[in-house]
C-alpha cells in the first residue's frame, strides 16, 4: 500500500530540483496520508442562485486539504487509472504541490521566468 502510493507521488517530482534532496523538499512538512477502505463521505454546503444554502453528502475517492492530510480511497489507488484516465494519487498530490506557495491556483511553485512560461503554455 505505502509503496504504491509513494511511487505514484514521486512521479510528480521527477526532474524537479538539482538533486533528490531538492526534489523531495516538495514533500517537506506533509504529515499524513489517510487511506480509506473505499469511497468516503464529504459533506459540503453550497448556495444556489436564489440564495438558499443546501447541504450535500457526496461519496468521494480523494481529497487534499490545505495545511492538512491527503485522503485517498484504497480501491481508487489500486485502480491507478480509471476509465476517465485520472490517477488519483497523482491528482491529489499535485494539489498538495500546488499549495506549497500558499496560492491554490493550479500552478506549482516556480521561479520567475519558469512561472511566466508555464502561464503562457497553459
What is each model feature region?
Residues 1-2, 83, 115:
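Generic detection of long, well-ordered alpha-helical segments
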Residues 1-42:
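Extended cationic-aromatic binding surfaces that line active-site or macromolecule-binding grooves
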Residues 27-90, 96-112:
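Active-site scaffold of zinc-dependent metalloenzymes
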Residues 91-95, 115-122:
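Hydrophobic alpha-helical transmembrane segments and adjacent short intramembrane/lumenal linkers
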Amino acid at each position: 500500500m505505502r509503496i504504491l502510493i509513494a511511487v505514484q507521488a514521486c512521479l510528480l517530482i521527477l526532474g524537479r530540483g538539482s538533486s533528490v534532496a531538492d526534489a523531495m523538499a516538495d514533500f517537506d512538512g506533509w504529515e499524513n496520508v489517510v487511506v480509506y477502505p473505499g469511497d468516503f463521505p464529504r459533506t459540503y454546503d453550497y448556495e444556489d442562485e436564489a440564495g438558499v444554502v443546501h447541504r450535500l453528502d457526496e461519496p468521494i475517492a480523494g481529497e487534499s486539504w490545505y495545511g492538512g492530510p491527503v485522503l485517498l480511497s484504497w480501491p481508487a489507488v489500486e485502480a491507478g487509472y480509471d476509465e476517465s484516465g485520472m490517477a488519483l494519487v497523482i491528482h491529489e498530490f499535485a494539489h498538495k504541490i500546488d499549495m506549497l506557495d500558499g496560492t491554490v491556483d493550479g500552478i506549482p511553485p516556480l521561479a520567475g521566468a519558469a512561472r511566466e512560461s508555464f502561464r503562457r503554455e497553459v
